[in-house]
Amino acid sequence: MLMGHSRVEPDGMYVPAPVSKVSYGTMVFIRSDIVMNAALYMKKAVTIAIRYNLVRRQSNPDTATGKECQVIDYQHSQRTLFPILAKAFAFHVTSDYMRRMYFEFQKNSRKKNDFSALPELHATSSGLKAYCSWATKDAIEACRLTCGGHGYMNLAGFGTTLASYAPNVTYEGDNNVLCLQTARYLLKVYRKMLTGETPPQVLGYLTGASSRSSLALGASLRDEKAILDAYAHRAWRLVTEACKVSGELTPDDAMRVHMVQWITAAKAHCAFVVMYNFILAYEETRPRVSADTLRVLHRLVCLHGLCGIDDTMGEFLEDAHIDGEQASDIRDEIFKLLKEIRPDAAALVDAFGLNDYFLNSALGAKDGDVYRRLYDEVQDAPLNKKHTPPGYAELLQPKLSRGNFGVSKL
């Protein structure tokens, strides 16, 4: 009864699981769910923010129509929101990858008694749980800021969303500790590779990387594979440098002595995994969608990749993999992509299929009738049922009617 990989014989003898860490499977499942929830909460926040930014108009009136500019048309709003939109798609396909990886492991462990995929599964789920939950927590707050003062109202939905999501960075394992779980695996794979073992497919970049970016060598800035090469090089450099400074230290000592360096390397690896899966999903989708849809998806893939480079540019400039001129070109290309994605922004958040009940936001409802919803909600608020606030008649009115305000002693 309730026996999985361990069992108890009729004579009472306990037979342990063939792999002592097989119990990690349950933790892995929860962490893969957290990656899925990261995508869901990021979709929720960016849907609310983009819909409100489409409705809200402020400053710079059009001379022809007299209408003020939609907030979504400001470059800063686009630079904040559209990369989050792209990242939500990236996290969605990465969560699918994690779940497929988990269920494949479950099938092999039960039917074939094959636990060989467990170390990679544990390391990947640990790192992605940390990477995705950090990014989503920050994205929710970034989305709230693009909505101005209204973003801080309870009616906006950001406050409750952030409050319910923020604990993800610490439960089921503190994120920094989980990054070190990924780092330990990277160190072990690297050391085994030096003895002639072939690393898993997703860690193939450890076998070596070019000293110069294919982007810098003339590849198009919209070549998704060239972008992935840049991510692979960054991960390769940071992991190999961390391995070299760790020398002959045991994994435990290496994580303790070079903790910051290893956490940075683990984040770079996770960024590569997300980018890898986003491109893979894009390629798999290619035969099934129209040319117009494919074009939009390609823009999202490129935007996610280029913004990831731009936001951590120092890590690419550090070893001159990308030079200053190329960094400037990447930034210019990002601004072009923002303009191209702008006409499809509403359709892209609609594609998430999140209903108004789940969004629970006056700012993000699908009908876009923001101000009527705000007015109706305020009218229904208990504090607005009476003309005076609670306590006025009991405390303030007697003093006001007597004129008894007191006299200053100064």
Residue ranges and their predicted role:
Residues M1-L410:
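Flavin-dependent oxidoreductase catalytic core characteristic
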